[in-house]
Amino acid sequence: MATVADHVIAVLKRSGVQRIFGIPGDSLNGLTDAIRRAGDFGWEQVRHEETAAFAAAAEAALRGGLAVCAGSCGPGNLHLINGLFDAQRSRVPVLAIAAHIPLAEVGSDYFQETHPQNLFRECSVYCELVSTPEQAPRILELAMRAAVEENGVAVVVVPGEIFGHRLDETAWGARPVRPTGSVCRPDEQGLRAAAAMLNSAANITILAGAGVAGAHDQVMELAHILAAPIVHALRGKEYIEYDNPYDVGMTGLLGFASGYKAIREADVLLMLGTDFPYQQFYPDRAQIIQVDIRGRNLGRRTPIDLGLLGTVADTVTALQPLLANKNDRSHLERSLKHYRKTRQRLDSLASNDRDRTPIRPEYVAAVANRLASDDAVFTVDVGSPVVWAARYVTMNGRRRLIGSFNHGTMACALPHAIGAQSVDRKRQVVALAGDGGLAMLFGELLTLTQNRLPVKVIVFNNSSLNFVELEMKAAGIVNFGTELDNPDFGAVATALGMFGRRVEHPADLEAALTEAFAHDGPAVVDVVTARQELSIPPAITAEQAKGFSLYAIRTILAGRSDELLDLVTINVARRILN
């Protein structure tokens, strides 16, 4: 007779799950022993449970199916929380198995006791306690169903002793748990209202988010009919940037002036599958149509004139026959011309200054992009690495870009890379890591060596919390508390038995990355980059300009004029502040 843990593994395998990320603990012994006995199911051990949740999120994003992580009772599953928040806000299906103290001890302030159902409620679509062995199969299936249908995190809390209980055969879990296919589009009245607005507008701009996944061709046809430039949010980049003659770049804090301008000049803004959060980048006077699969998102970020509930693919397909071709393509042509100028200016910043040190981070990202494989998976840390990835890593329909783009947590690049590489050890995975982010979960470099994961880690080593410093400058504050006294990360990698290099001169960068990418195991390339590089947003507000002026004055008064000189030398001399 199988145990509860045996049933869990069998159901997961039947539903296409191949591994669980986690760290062993006594309350998980029944589960890990079942994995050992199964023989054909993976246990991906990491060095911190937070990494287990990040890795599961990356696997779910990459495979498009359920991924699983586990944590032992108390502190073990508490460590999962940050990674689970990331998965929940990225809308990827993750099952978290949170082991619990013995059921008889609940409520007694027992060793390592917490209240997992309360703790995980905010970062999940489903969170329930298994109170009896007989209840386990049903709760497991309900949790898996919630995760795959709602694209979110489901948490099953299991007292450790329940894993080892024998279980009679049950119909629960007898069939694979996979997402159901469906068609979702607005009704005819909504479609006709949208068509009327679009047909009467002169200047239409499309803002595309992650919801355009799987709808690339439909959106291209729509843009052609409407003569509409396409601006993308960061999460839409990998799905819409490639093979796109209507692309005018990103908007937002990380975006391009051309994307910002195309939105500001629109009569109608058509939002497709995006929950873009920054209100200051929306147009003041345009009519706005929003298409989203989640009704709660409609009108959440900016007032809208029309909300349409449906998938982007289904909605656009139904809308196209109602639209008239636009003969006036001047808005599109102006936007594309501006984009070409913006793109040329950005590319000029990524040129190789062979004698200038520290190295420009733009150049690092551009070289990594050029040398990486056509189907590479890029994972990026929150902070300045996201800026450089957004601007210089190009998508082609085969590459992937994974990061904490909604939750915004540091230290995600390496754990996400672990999850991505675990799915396919032959696919190139490149982690663009900040020095601060890498240091937070530095022990996971050991996971790369122990699990034989050939992840390539590129460290943007500017010896600071760089993006935090930029925010301080914009607020008119003298940098404080952002200094990082870093080691030679390449030497540390070598000491751990990995390929390690440190690059301090631009002339050495390409050779180091080429060697690292060709290496058959994990590799770390520590690149010393310019600390004072400014990732200027597409539009600077009066308040931000005032902030930079105050920063300059206060920096001089604080006796740190050398910092200001570096800032001016690196940025003003290169004409990116005008």
Give the ranges of each region predicted by the language model.
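Catalytic phosphate/nucleotide-handling subdomain of diverse soluble enzymes
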Residues: 416-456
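Glycine/charged-rich beta-loop-alpha catalytic/anionic-binding loops adjacent to active sites
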Residues: 36-43, 61-68, 391-406, 473-476
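N-terminal alpha/beta PP-like core and its mobile active-site loop of ThDP/TPP-dependent enzymes
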Residues: 1-329, 367, 371-374, 454-457, ...
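Active-site diphosphate/adenylate-binding microenvironment
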Residues: 5-15, 26, 31-36, 340-415, ...
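Active-site nucleophile and cofactor-binding loops and adjacent substrate-binding regions
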Residues: 23-25, 44-54, 69-75, 131-133, ...
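Thiamine diphosphate
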Residues: 112, 450-543
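A general structural motif
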Residues: 48, 108-109, 181-193, 252-255, ...
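Phosphate/pyrophosphate-binding active-site segments
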Residues: 134, 157, 169-170, 181, ...
